[in-house]
A protein has these predicted regions:
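Conserved N-terminal helical subregion
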Residues: 71-177, 185-190
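Central beta-strand plus flanking loop segment that forms part of the substrate or channel wall
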Residues: 57, 171-207, 214-216, 238-242, ...
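Glycine-rich FAD pyrophosphate-binding loop
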Residues: 22-47
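N-terminal FAD cofactor-binding segment of flavoenzymes
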Residues: 43-84
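C-terminal helical "tail/cap" subdomain of flavin- and related membrane-associated enzymes
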Residues: 323-402
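Conserved FAD/dinucleotide-binding core of flavoprotein oxidoreductases
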Residues: 211-278
Length: 402
């Protein structure tokens, strides 16, 4: 039987796309390498996702938001950009929610909660039949022609569909198998992520702190359920070789180290989760489409996390592609026509290019330690604090309403 659509990857992007297509009449199958248990009940991975107001609206439409649970959604009211260490002349720029039409700039939700909600929304009760989800499957080959796309699985089975969509991460093997090149930038840094409690309140404010030799981020979470103390997701970015010693430290030593790195500004910080590390690599696929093929989410554009736009941009790609597919199907047109795929590519690349380039520029500038770079970034923060129209533009970008 020929399928309408095969989505490779049942992470948040693939599952959200499958959910967006429910009730459209399209026959959709998801292929995932992980086990069904890992997809249904994803493990905590340390990552908190900053969601714009626009992304929250899309997630409500897809039925994900109501499945997250109120206690798993933390409001992000303000953002604070810092440059320079404690005890030095530290530059600050505050982006207030008062610069936006909403009572908060956005929201913070743990990645594993988003993954769980996406599975429940895609596979649970809802409009139209659920897609087919096949776990423990690996794609070993892909061929396309004017009529169909054919995927070969590790088991030797061949599947045929009118369109294949890659949603299998920024290191997408499906994209690579289609011969699509990608510009990849290794920033030479790894981020360590974990949850920590602290006695001083975070005031629902996210920090992005560009200190000398390190970058720190603080993402405000809801209070710790065990102690009631303020709790934050902590992100420490260092050169690759400097992360492992922090992962190997016992909890007491790690708490001391992180309290010191934050200059004691939050009081004594205490670990409240496992620690995780992720190398930072930016990816820009040179093409998002090919014959009977499209890429979404990180498989299309993999962002550096410094501007917190990765998942939000991925949701935008899903919204753009799903609407085009549904419209074509309802009009009796080919869902993988070259014209449709080219329009999707142009629309999403236009939406992503400026953000990707700006994010890359910021990430590059703030990893350089020579004196001119320090002067430049300090000057940018100080100028931004004085220039309200710039802060208003940043607030619009953070909310996704700009």
């Amino acid at each position: 039987m020929e399928l309408d659509l095969i989505i490779v990857g049942a992470g948040p992007a693939g599952l959200s796309l499958a959910r967006a297509l429910r009730g459209s009449g399209l026959n959709v199958t998801l292929l995932e390498q992980q086990s069904l248990a890992a997809v249904q009940q994803p493990a905590f991975d340390g990552r908190e996702i900053a969601l714009t107001q626009h992304s929250a609206a899309l997630m409500r439409q897809l039925g994900l938001w109501s499945r997250l649970g109120d206690t798993n959604i933390a409001p992000l009211k303000d953002a604070l950009v810092l440059d320079g260490g404690v005890g030095t002349t530290q530059s600050r720029m505050r982006i207030s929610h008062s610069l936006s039409p909403k009572p908060e700039l956005g929201f913070l939700v743990a990645n594993h909660h988003i993954r769980r909600a996406a599975h429940e929304a895609a596979m649970g009760e809802g409009k139209g039949p659920a897609p087919t989800l096949r776990c423990g499957e690996q794609v070993t080959g892909i061929r396309t022609d004017a009529e169909a796309a054919r995927l070969t699985l590790a088991s030797g089975e061949t599947l045929q569909a009118r369109l294949v969509v890659a949603a299998d991460s920024r290191h997408s093997s499906t994209r690579r198998a289609m011969g699509i090149a990608a510009d990849m930038h290794d920033y030479g840094r790894t981020m360590l992520v974990c949850n920590m409690t602290h006695p001083q309140p975070h005031e629902e404010t996210a920090w992005e702190w560009f200190d000398h030799g390190q970058t720190l981020a603080l993402l405000p979470m809801n209070p710790d359920p065990a102690s009631g103390l303020p709790r934050s997701s902590v992100v420490l970015t260092l050169p690759h070789q400097d992360i492992q010693p922090l992962l190997d430290m016992d909890e007491t030593a790690f708490n001391r180290a992180m309290t010191s790195r934050f200059g004691g500004q939050l009081g004594d910080m205490r670990l409240s989760s496992t620690r995780h590390a992720y190398p930072l690599v930016g990816v820009w696929a040179r093409r998002l489409v090919a014959q009977r093929f499209a890429a979404v989410g990180d498989a299309a554009v993999g962002m550096h996390p410094v501007t917190a736009h990765g998942f939000n941009l991925g949701l935008r790609s899903i919204d753009t592609l799903s609407k085009a597919l549904v419209q074509a199907h309802q009009g009796g047109q080919d869902i993988a026509s070259p014209q449709l795929l080219e329009r999707y590519q142009q629309t999403h690349q236009r939406a992503a290019r400026g953000l990707y380039m700006a994010t890359h520029a910021v990430a590059t500038l703030y990893t350089r330690e020579h004196v001119p770079a320090r002067w430049l970034r300090r000057g940018m923060v100080e100028l931004g604090e004085r220039f309200t129209p710039f802060k208003r533009a940043v607030a619009a970008s953070l909310t996704g309403l700009g």
